[in-house]
Amino acid sequence: MANEIKEIQVHSIPEFMQQILAFEYEGDCTVYFRGESKDHKGTAFQPSIYRKLKHLEKEHLIYREMQRFNNHEFTEDRSAFDKLSRMQHYLAPTRLIDFSEDALTALYFALATRKTCDDAIVYVTAVANEKIKYYDSDAVSVISNLAKLPLDNDDIREKSKRAIADDANKAMLKSNRIDEYKNCKSTDFLLHEIKEEKSYFSHIIDPQHIFSAQFVKPKLTNTRIYGQKGAFLLFGLNFDDVKSHIPIIQYENNAPVLLDNILIQHPIKKILKLKISCKIDLTHLKKLGVTTPYIYTGMDKVSEHLKKISE
C-alpha cells in the first residue's frame, strides 16, 4: 500500500510553522521532523551505511574500529544501539537516520549544510505511538546487533547478514514463522551477539523484526542527542535485497509516496514534505535563538561558534 506525500514550498519561518500546525493525521501519533540539505527524492530516508556498498560490506569492521580507537567515548554505552547512536553523531556510517522532536532543529540541519540555492527539505512525520520503541527494546537489540555481522562470510556462511536474511525470508513464508526461524543456524550467531548485552535474552526472534525499520527513543546520555532532541529510525534488512535499504519513500509518476505493506514494516503513518526556499536562511533562525550552540551543546562546537562570531 502507498500513500501520497504532499509537497509544499515555504518562503518564511511563519509559513513554515503554519504548515506544521496545520499538519493533520489519524490515530495516536507523535510528530517528528527530519531536515535534509537538498531533495534526495527516493533516497531521502536512506541510512548512510547503504549509500556505498563498501560501507555495508565493512559495517562489522566500522562498528569495532570506532570503539577500538575511541573506547573512552563508549564507556557509558551498554548496548549495540547505544553505540550505534553515538557513532551516528560522529558521522560514522550506520543503519540509523536522525529525527528530531523540534521543528526548528530539523530546519537548522536542512539549512546549515545547504550548498546551493536549491530547496532544502524538512520532512514532517506522524509516527504511531504504539510502534515507538525505547533503547532497551528486544526488537531494537535484534536489529542493532546485525551491525556486528559481515554481509557475507566465506568461512562460516551462517555467520552473515545474507544467511540471516535468507533464513528469515524462508521462515516468513511459514504460518509458525517464529518457531521456524528458531531452528535456523544463523539465528544462533545473531543470538550470540545479542546476549553480549542481554544475557537473559530468550531463544526467540520474530523474523519480521529482521525486515523492519523501528523508530527508537535513545538514552540522552550523549550531549549531541540531548541538544538535538534526537530520535532514530533504525533499519533492519531489506526482504528483497540484502544490499539495499528498506524503502520508505518511492516516486511514482514523479510524485513521492509513502510505502507501507506487510514486507515493509515501519511506524510512519504520514509524511508532509516542506521545500524550504532560499528566502529562508540561518539568520532567520538566529533571531529565534537557534544557533550552533543551541544544536551542538558540546564544548568543541560552542568554542568554535564563539571564535567565529568574534572574528
Description of each model-found segment:
Residues 1-311:
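Catalytic-core elements of nucleic-acid end-processing and repair enzymes
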